[in-house]
Design a protein with these regions (language model features):
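Extended, low-polarity transmembrane helix blocks
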Residues: 10-55, 73-81, 85-88, 92-159
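Single conserved hydrophobic/aromatic residue that forms the stacking wall/gate
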Residues: 1-11
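Perimembrane loop-to-helix junctions flanking transmembrane segments
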Residues: 60-73
Length: 159
């Protein structure tokens, strides 16, 4: 009857609102899209730092910080590798967790060593990158990644 239809509509609306406000679990596709967006955003941002270092290599190679005692030039090359090559793999989700290790290591060195005694405002960017990269490392690359497609292809060949 009319009252039952109204109750059904009200219950449906309340159910939608409840699920929106209190989701029981994240939707796989939505979560993977979020991870993809974060990979692209933070990968491109970190890559821009590597491009800047690469473009100014001649100027920076003699004076780049050497916190590991391996020389300014090698420290710069490793920073460029972490910020450019690994960022590219991170964006595409290729060897995702392996690529993230140098990125996380670079941000640890930047935050704890290079800017260790600086005020937080100076090292805040390295901290943000570090936290985001650790969280994304834990989350994994999502299903919109080369790793996901490679894993699917390898799994289908096992059968």
């Amino acid at each position: 009857s009319r009252r039952q239809r109204q109750m059904c509509i009200r219950d449906s609306i309340m159910s939608v609102i409840y699920k929106f406000l209190f989701p029981s679990k994240p939707d796989g596709t939505a979560m993977s899209l979020l991870i993809l967006a974060l990979r692209i955003l933070f990968g491109v941002l970190l890559m821009s730092h590597g491009v800047q270092k690469w473009a100014n290599y001649d100027v920076m190679s003699g004076s780049f910080p050497d916190p590991l005692g391996i020389g300014s030039q090698l420290s710069l090359v490793l920073a460029i590798f972490g910020e450019m090559v690994c960022s590219m793999a991170f964006i595409f989700g290729f060897l995702y967790r392996l690529a993230m290790i140098p990125m996380i290591f670079t941000m640890c060195i930047a935050f704890f060593v290079v800017h260790g005694s600086d005020p937080f405002a100076v090292k805040e960017l390295a901290f943000i990158y570090l936290v985001v990269f650790i969280l994304l490392y834990i989350a994994g690359p999502g299903k919109f990644s080369l790793d996901h497609f490679i894993a699917k292809a390898l799994a289908s060949h096992k059968k």
